[in-house]
Amino acid sequence: MAHKKGTGSTRNGRDSNAQRLGVKRFGGQAVIAGNILVRQRGTKFHAGNNVGIGKDDTLFALVDGVVTFERKGKSRKKVSVYPAAAAEAVAS
């Protein structure tokens, strides 16, 4: 008679890949048109001036400029991109 136990099986051992969400370009950073600013699920950040929104809620720059994070009302946050010349006027 064999003296080895059967090894059995497990139902664990799986994990999904990370989605790599989050802010990709921060406030004050220079960006070019097409740069991804925020990868998100849902609209944690809303699109502001010169920012487009993809079908998966990704925010991206529509023009070359500088990124700014702003408040939109009490609880909403929005991301805008201002052209370099206009960004200096907004900052001051």
UniProtKB/Swiss-Prot annotation:
Ranges annotated as spanning the membrane: none
Domain of life: Bacteria
Coiled coil regions in record: none
InterPro entries registered for this protein in UniProt: Ribosomal_bL27 (IPR001684), Ribosomal_bL27_CS (IPR018261)
Pfam families referenced in this protein's UniProt entry, alphabetically: Ribosomal_L27
Keywords: Ribonucleoprotein, Ribosomal protein
Gene Ontology terms: cellular component: cytosolic large ribosomal subunit
Gene Ontology BP annotations: translation
Molecular function (Gene Ontology), one example: structural constituent of ribosome
NCBIfam families: L27
HAMAP family registered for this protein in UniProt: Ribosomal_bL27 (MF_00539)
Similarity-based family: Belongs to the bacterial ribosomal protein bL27 family.
Protein name as annotated: Large ribosomal subunit protein bL27
